[in-house]
A protein has these predicted regions:
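A short, polar/proline- and glycine-enriched secondary-structure boundary/capping micro-motif
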Residues: 24-25, 84-85, 161-162
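Charged, amphipathic alpha-helical segments
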Residues: 1, 70-93
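Short, acidic/charged, Gly/Pro-enriched secondary-structure junctions
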Residues: 83-118
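Intrinsically disordered, low-complexity terminal/linker regions enriched in Pro/Ser/Gly
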Residues: 151-162
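Short, low-complexity, polar/charged sequence segments that are solvent-exposed and flexible
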Residues: 31-32, 90-97, 122-126, 138-142, ...
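Short beta-strand and beta-hairpin "edge-sheet" elements
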Residues: 106-150
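Residue-level detection of beta-strand scaffold positions
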Residues: 69-71, 100-102, 143-145
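Solvent-exposed edge beta-strands and adjacent loop segments
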Residues: 2-77, 120-135
Length: 162
């Protein structure tokens, strides 16, 4: 029987390739304060193949999937997030200058595998503010690879630190 899972304890990590083109298998750093992650499960485009022989329905074949450009990750804006995102951006710029990519991992407690994708993060800006609300920010990561499921690394254990 399947065990239903909760979003409690979902975590976001980043790591830099050691060898160009290969997802890192260790050395990931956690980013705290995540409130929401985007869907990495887009519907494929459909390509119409209907001919004049069809009398009632159009026909299609699957096309490419589109993650939609820059992915939105929502965080509580804290001094710790600013420090960690600045460190992430420094690591990204260093990796980019060396011809290496940055990888991101979304870890769900209770699943044996994590969800990985290579991406280019954007610098953090100033979020919208309004009266009597939690200060949140949306940070952006543009995917440069298809998402993959793979085993969690050692630093991605299911223990949830509060």
């Amino acid at each position: 029987m399947a065990i239903n899972l909760s979003t409690i304890g979902v975590r976001l990590y980043y790591g830099v390739e050691v060898t160009a083109g290969e997802r890192p298998t260790s050395g990931y750093t956690r980013i705290f304060g995540i409130k929401s992650t985007p869907s990495l499960n887009p519907a494929p485009d459909t390509i119409e193949t209907t001919t004049l022989d069809e009398l009632e329905y159009k026909t299609y074949v699957d096309g490419l999937k589109d993650l939609g450009g820059a992915l939105e990750f929502t965080f509580n804006l804290t001094e710790e997030l600013i420090t960690r995102w600045d460190a992430l951006m420094t690591a990204y710029e260093t990796a980019k200058a060396s011809g290496l990519r940055m990888w991101f991992a979304i870890v769900v407690p209770g699943l044996t595998k994590a969800f990985y994708f290579a991406g280019n993060p954007s610098s953090m800006g100033l979020p919208e503010t309004s009266v009597n609300t939690v200060l949140e920010i949306t940070n952006y990561i543009t995917p440069v690879s298809a998402p993959v499921k793979a085993d969690k690394t050692a630093e991605m254990t299911d223990s949830v630190s509060l």
